[in-house]
């Protein structure tokens, strides 16, 4: 996925798809911005989730819809040696808890692009992600090849997943990732229409091939650089190697001066 936009922009209204009359903005490529702060240990309710309203509290202001992009965001600007770890296809109760435990142990945040068919029966893991300050992204319901399905089917895949996430954590996703990294115009338009930015990756661990923890670690080491987005998986097969590899490469990255972070919740 060469030539994709640089990561880092406002986190905008997630899955604002109930207003289907609104039209997406003009096509554009992404600009650079800083990543978010390092993780804070669990605060309840978490900053990711909607805060409870007091009796006279003001309602949350609607967030702006993102513009339609022609390419997915590929990386962030790398300020302060920032990197992003992302995990796709979950949550899976066999592997996601181990990943969450390692992230919590090192007090860092990551992004989880969840599939609705996995999330619907594992909402407790979504809440755990949110409570720990991780960002939850939309990875469709059944992980289809988006260019091969109709626009209406694509909308249903994305909207259903948005709803599951919002039901679980009180706020819909603001980020979307196409399965297999296969994007088309409909995917970009619907993602923006539903309030999400498209995020790809820079470093693919290929952990889904089950190459062994040592190989996964070696690929992360080789690809580590300021601004990169690392792709791994926490479901979709035996992901024990991914869990084991994270225990080794995460502290190595931190010891090397990398700041493992997530996109800023503020605009550029």
For each feature predicted by the language model, list its residue ranges.
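Active-site glycine-centered loops adjacent to acidic/histidine catalytic or metal-binding residues
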Residues: 88, 139, 179
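Structural preference for beta-strand elements that scaffold enzyme active sites
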Residues: 84, 111, 135-137, 175, ...
């Amino acid at each position: 996925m060469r030539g994709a936009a640089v990561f880092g922009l406002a986190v905008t209204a997630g899955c604002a798809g109930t207003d289907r009359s609104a039209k997406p903005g003009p096509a554009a490529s992404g600009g650079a911005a800083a990543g978010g702060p390092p993780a804070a240990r669990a605060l309840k309710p978490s900053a990711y989730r909607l805060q409870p309203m007091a009796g006279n509290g003001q309602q949350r202001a609607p967030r702006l819809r993102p513009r339609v992009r022609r390419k997915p965001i590929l990386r962030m600007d790398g300020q302060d040696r920032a990197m992003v770890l992302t995990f796709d296809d979950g949550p899976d109760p066999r592997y996601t808890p181990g990943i969450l435990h390692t992230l919590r142990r090192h007090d860092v945040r990551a992004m989880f692009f969840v599939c609705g068919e996995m999330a619907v029966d594992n909402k407790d893991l979504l809440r755990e992600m949110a409570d720990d300050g991780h960002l939850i992204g939309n990875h469709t319901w059944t992980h289809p090849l988006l260019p091969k399905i109709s626009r209406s089917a694509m909308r249903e895949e994305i909207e259903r997943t948005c709803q599951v996430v919002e039901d679980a954590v009180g706020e819909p996703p603001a980020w979307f990732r196409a399965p297999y990294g296969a994007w088309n115009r409909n995917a970009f338009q619907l993602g923006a229409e539903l309030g999400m930015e498209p995020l790809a990756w820079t470093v693919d661990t290929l952990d889904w091939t089950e190459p062994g923890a040592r190989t996964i670690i070696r690929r992360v080491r080789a690809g580590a650089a300021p601004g990169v987005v690392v792709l791994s998986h926490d479901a979709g097969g035996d992901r024990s190697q991914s869990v084991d590899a994270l225990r080794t490469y995460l502290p190595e990255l931190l010891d090397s001066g990398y700041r493992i972070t997530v996109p800023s919740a503020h605009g550029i």
